[in-house]
Every structure is written in structure tokens, then in C-alpha cells.
Amino acid sequence: MRYTKSEEAMKVAETLMPGGVNSPVRAFKSVDTPAIFMDHGKGSKIYDIDGNEYIDYVLSWGPLILGHRDPQVISHLHEAIDKGTSFGASTLLENKLAQLVIDRVPSIEKVRMVSSGTEATLDTLRLARGYTGRNKIVKFEGCYHGHSDSLLIKAGSGVATLGLPDSPGVPEGIAKNTITVPYNDLDALKIAFEKFGDDIAGVIVEPVAGNMGVVPPIEGFLQGLRDITTEYGALLIFDEVMTGFRVGYHCAQGYFGVTPDLTCLGKVIGGGLPVGAFGGKKEIMDHIAPLGNIYQAGTLSGNPLAMTSGYETLSQLTPETYEYFNMLGDILEDGLKRVFAKHNVPITVNRAGSMIGYFLNEGPVTNFEQANKSDLKLFAEMYREMAKEGVFLPPSQFEGTFLSTAHTKEDIEKTIQAFDTALSRIVK
């Protein structure tokens, strides 16, 4: 494939934006390949400015669960645009999407719309601290919750360690109120609560980790979080920005049967437009302004375009949608295992609903340490060869692969064949 126009566009972009991008992963640095500039998408396909066609498994990093340019979403967006883009006042569209979210997400009795997943997690932590009167938050190593200061934290050497900044610009004073423990490790969490339990406001977790690849919870982990937080009077917060409506019809919490106190949402609930949300029990949510004294606001929160796209996306999802995802996922997983075995290359495949992650190691992969054992050099080679075969995968080992309702069995079979062809060139 030729990338001449993308390479020229990137040269210009690098003079205008840091690294030429507005989000780091789009620079494609971890796979050592030129950034691709996209032109348009349709269904399961995406097309770059050089005219190359790809089967798309990035799907805008998750939001496009119906694929690109879904007719129902696009039609209603045109109607909404004709009325105006934003009013700075409430619209009926906010009621419609809020009611749909409340009906489908077990933990949410009231919801507040915001404009991004980062905003949702940031506001949720402020609410948790304000509601409990405590300062510390527990997060898990390898789980990403947006780029707010208190969540850009890495683990130290101890089992339960007060956080150190993971990025310059994050004050140590803020970092010290974040405790990081290994994902899927209840013993480590218990130690954290034994040390700091009286000052832990909440535990935030991706119920399926999606930012170290795709790493589902081991049996009993989520229920263990529920039990421990309840025992200590801390809040359990599910960050379902990625898993929300991707793992199941009632999100990950419905799929796994564990109900948190607060939930963060994003991605799918905007259908491709900037949206986030957080919600939970009425008794907690009523502490948010204007009812309570915990402040939160947003100029474009609940804007009519995002509410339209979100509602028209979620309204098309049914329990049968997830049966379809499971069918496609079964075919893809079986095909990957068969092809990699054929070429004697180790692979571990993790799945949750329409999220799929593959690691180039023997496995299992249940935490960030194990995910880091993947062969990153081989992953980069695989990415480049798959792009040549017309398959657009996430350009990072630590990002998930997504399915949409627009994907077909034919797409999956072509993808499996592309892996076979790519491996034939890589493995000598």
C-alpha cells in the first residue's frame, strides 16, 4: 500500500501540533510506521486519504459499535443539526438518553452527562471524596481512567504503594492520594485497606481492563471488590467508559452481576461524538450541584448533537446484538488460534463481549505484568503486515480490538486469512 498523501499530511501536521496529532496513539510510534490520515468510513470499512481500504477494528477506539455512518444515526444527526448545534439550556434529547441509560445500567438511578470519559472519571472521584469525606482513591495497575492528575499514577515496588506521578506536571501531593495495586489481586487490595482504609473514598476499576490489551476479571475479583469496599464504607466505582454497552446489554456490571455505587460511561453512549457520563445511586448523585454542594458543570454537556447520536446508537442495541458479537468473536478467536499454531507463534486471546485482545505470549494474561511479556517487536511487525492486507488494527499492544454490528462473517474470515498471510511473511 502507498501512504504518500498521509506522509505529506503528517509533515505539515508536525509543524502545527505536538507530534502532529491530537492524541498520542495516533502517531503510530509503538509500531514504527507512518501515521495514517483517514478520509471516510462506511460500515465495517475505513478509507485513508491515499485511497486504501481497511476492515476497521479500531472503530474510533470503541465508540462506533454500529460501524461507520450508520444510516439511522446520520439521518437523525442531520435533523438535529438543522435545529442548532448547542443552546446552553436543556433539551428533551437529554431526557431521552438519560432515561435509556438509567433503564439499562443497573447501578444508575440518576445520571449527569459530560463531554468526555476523562471528565466523567474526574468528576466521579470528586463526588466520591465529597460524599465520603475521605481523600484516597485506589486504582489498579494498567487500568487507564483518563488523563486527570490523580489517575495518571503508576505503582511503586510495594504491594500496596502510595502513587508516584506517571507524567511530569502531576504534583506528588496529588499523587500521594492515589493507591495503586495489581489488577485481579484481592490480597493486595486487602493490604491497602488495612493500611489506609479509614481514608479511602473509593476504588475505581475497569471491570474489564481495556488499556493493557483486553484483560477480563478473574472469577470472584469484582465481587471481592464489592465486598471489601462495603466492609470499609468506601465507594465502588466502575469505569465503564470502554466496557459500557460493549460487554453486554446491561454493560459489564450486568454481565458479571456485580453492581457498583457509581459508574462512568463514554465512547458508545456518544455514538462517535464527544460524550461522557457518570451516575449512580440517587442518595449519592443528589450531592452534585445544583442539589448539593459538590460542583460540576460543562458548557457543552448534554449538547443536542451528542445526545442524538448517543440515543440513536443505544436504541438499536438489543440482547440479540451481543449474541451476534459472541458468534463473530468465536470465529475470530478460533481462527487466530488456528493460524498462529500453524506458524508456531504463541498467542493468548482474551475476550469480553465485542472486545478482543491478543497477546503474543504463552499466557495467561490476567494483569499488567503478564501483558508486558508480549512480544512487542513481533506485534509491530504484525501490525505493519496486517495494514498491507487491508486490516486496520489498534497500533498498540495495549489497546483493545473492537467489533461492530457492521462486521460480517466475511470480514472475519478475510481478517483470519490476512493474519495467515502476514505470518507467512514474518515467520521464516
Swiss-Prot record:
GO BP: protoporphyrinogen IX biosynthetic process
Residues that bear N6-(pyridoxal phosphate)lysine: 267
InterPro entries from the UniProt entry: 4pyrrol_synth_GluAld_NH2Trfase, Aminotrans_3, Aminotrans_3_PPA_site, PyrdxlP-dep_Trfase, PyrdxlP-dep_Trfase_major, PyrdxlP-dep_Trfase_small
Pfam families linked to this entry: Aminotran_3
EC number(s) recorded for this UniProt protein: 5.4.3.8
Pathway: Porphyrin-containing compound metabolism; protoporphyrin-IX biosynthesis; 5-aminolevulinate from L-glutamyl-tRNA(Glu): step 2/2
Cofactor(s) the record lists: pyridoxal 5'-phosphate
One GO CC term on file: cytoplasm
Compartments it resides in: Cytoplasm
Record keywords: Cytoplasm, Isomerase, Porphyrin biosynthesis, Pyridoxal phosphate
GO molecular function: glutamate-1-semialdehyde 2,1-aminomutase activity; pyridoxal phosphate binding; transaminase activity
Sequence similarity: Belongs to the class-III pyridoxal-phosphate-dependent aminotransferase family. HemL subfamily.
HAMAP family: HemL_aminotrans_3
Protein name per Swiss-Prot or TrEMBL: Glutamate-1-semialdehyde 2,1-aminomutase 1
Species for this entry: Staphylococcus aureus (strain JH9)
Name of the encoding gene: hemL1
